[in-house]
């Protein structure tokens, strides 16, 4: 199977500590698929919630299809995510007991299907974000020093 990246949530790894990753399918309408093929999908500020034993992706944007008609889709509608019932039950336990969040990390094509890589995540505090930034800056500086010495 080939994996072609559609969109990535770059802020997710900065704002959250990713504990576990899972793959989920998405229930889409026809114009949404066409819009995704045109690269009009955004994962920023979106999340997943469990509602009545089903998993939904909220606040994710798939822009209007340019060549669509009056039956075009709603860009910010909630979309059902496809997982096995056993996996959803496990997610319910993690979210309720430990206070974790479910956030999309990236969207990609797997064959002809659109898949979301979800992260079970814990929010970082401000000082954790500062430490991450400091560590990243130090790694860049270290690489720069090593380059100039060789």
From Swiss-Prot:
Principal subcellular localisation of the protein: cytoplasm
Pfam family, one: SmpB
InterPro entries according to UniProt: SmpB, SsrA-bd_prot, SsrA-bd_prot_CS
CDD domains: SmpB
Domain of life: Bacteria
Cysteines joined through disulfide linkages: none
Gene3D superfamilies reported for this sequence: 2.40.280.10
One annotated GO molecular function: RNA binding
Keyword ATP-binding: no
PROSITE patterns in the record: SSRP
UniProt keyword annotations, A-Z: Cytoplasm, RNA-binding
Subcellular location: Cytoplasm
Single biological process term from Gene Ontology: trans-translation
Gene Ontology cellular component terms for the protein in this record: cytosol
Function: Required for rescue of stalled ribosomes mediated by trans-translation. Binds to transfer-messenger RNA (tmRNA), required for stable association of tmRNA with ribosomes. tmRNA and SmpB together mimic tRNA shape, replacing the anticodon stem-loop with SmpB. tmRNA is encoded by the ssrA gene; the 2 termini fold to resemble tRNA(Ala) and it encodes a 'tag peptide', a short internal open reading frame. During trans-translation Ala-aminoacylated tmRNA acts like a tRNA, entering the A-site of stalled ribosomes, displacing the stalled mRNA.
Record-stated family: Belongs to the SmpB family.
PANTHER family the record matches: SSRA-BINDING PROTEIN, TMRNA-BINDING COMPONENT OF TRANS-TRANSLATION TAGGING COMPLEX
UniProt protein name: SsrA-binding protein
Source organism per UniProt: Magnetococcus marinus (strain ATCC BAA-1437 / JCM 17883 / MC-1)
Organism classification: Bacteria, Pseudomonadati, Pseudomonadota, Alphaproteobacteria, Magnetococcales
């Amino acid at each position: 199977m080939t994996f072609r990246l559609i969109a990535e949530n770059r802020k997710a790894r900065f704002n959250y500590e990713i504990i576990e990753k899972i793959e989920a399918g998405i229930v889409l309408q026809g114009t949404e698929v066409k819009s995704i093929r045109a690269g009009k999908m955004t994962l920023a500020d979106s999340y997943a919630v469990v509602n009545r034993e089903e998993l939904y992706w909220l606040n994710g944007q798939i822009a209007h299809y340019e060549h669509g008609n009056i039956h075009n889709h709603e860009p910010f509608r909630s979309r059902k995510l496809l997982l096995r019932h056993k996996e959803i039950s496990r997610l319910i336990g993690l979210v309720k007991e430990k206070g974790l969040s479910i956030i999309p990390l990236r969207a990609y094509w797997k064959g002809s299907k659109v898949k979301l890589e979800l992260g079970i995540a814990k929010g970082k505090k401000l000082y954790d974000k500062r430490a991450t930034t400091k560590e990243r800056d130090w790694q860049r500086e270290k690489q720069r020093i090593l380059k100039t010495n060789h």
